[in-house]
Amino acid sequence: MKYDIVLFDLDGTLLNTLEDLADSVNYVMMQMGYPVHPLESIRQFVGNGIRILMVKATPQGEENPRFEEAFAMFKAYYLTHNQIETRPYDGVMELLHDYEEQDMPMAIVTNKNQESVDVLVRDVFKNHVRVAVGDDGIRPRKPAAAPVEEALRRLRQVYADRSWARMGVEDALSEEDWLEWIKPHVLYVGDSDVDAATAENSGVDCALCAWGFREESLLETLPHVVLLHKPLELEAFVRG
């Protein structure tokens, strides 16, 4: 195997969430009397978490005196409307099923708020993915390395019997040293410039997927080890 661990972005990588995000944004815009946004504008707004999404969507952003009201309205509405049109991309469920059958360590690392992540992992993926790190409002968001490193720490606990998880236990290797040791064995899969920067900042390899929210022409300019056009292409690449 070329990699021991696979990490996935969520929106635009595993799930097509664009329409539900757009509908939720525009619900808030209409409720507050602001202009609505076309789907393609929302596509460009996503990637840095829902607060940044709403900063970009709300006139004057955080300078708007009603911004916090708009943001709270979005969070409440989206939490109960995040599975209307949201679907896994073709081939994603088969890929996750195959990896689960192989007991392949995998995790989700996303800027989506943790509450929504937990709901989607439970309802869409039926908890096939055992570790999912979202935005908890405390830890730095992607493209910082912190979410990736948190996912790796949790995977080490979940897969404590693996040789790579046990590495350093006997000789008291520090957690920081273990993270640096494991990173060459990790692949991060995403669909955007944020994901490429996350992988680079985290010191792990990046696979980019062309079926997501960004144009392939942009993806080709970003640092990556492979550009995927179908989810199942990932299996062959990871196997080497």
Task: Pin down the residues of each PLM region.
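Active-site neighborhood of HAD-like aspartate-dependent phosphohydrolases
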Residues: 1-44
